[in-house]
Amino acid sequence: MKSIRIKGQNGDFSIADVGFGYSQILPVITKLWHTSYIINLYNSNNNFYSRLRFRELDKSIILMEQPELHLHPAMQAKVADAFIKTVDATRESETPSTLIIETHSQAIINRIGRRIREGKVSPDDVNVLLFQKDEKLQITMIKQIKFSNEGQLRNWPYGFFDPED
């Protein structure tokens, strides 16, 4: 019987013993790793026939819904770094990855902003779409919000992360 173990500063632990967040994020991290691995394998193989096997990798689009669920905010920030590393690992390839992430995580948004401020991510590579219900019209409006070069969200609605009283 096989088991998944998590290595930490205080030793190794079974995934069943470290909290629900690890088991929830494992498929996300596995998909990110697999995408980077397959694309790098594809790009490093100069054999024409071997490359034919991978031609469906013309563009890799990964969709994720609330990857932050059950994760500590510090771990959410690390997951954001994993998103950035996946895109970076495939950026120069013939098959770059695009990630579409639905999140309510301030930690993920803030980490992406920090990486932009540090120059590790271009603000042009990030799109934030905000879905807001218009109570008067009873429809949901979609607003595109961009990061500045300093990693700040432009025109972010007041009270989104800190609700008004």
Spell out what each predicted region is.
Residues 1-157, 161-162:
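Switch/communication elements of ASCE P-loop NTPase nucleotide-binding domains
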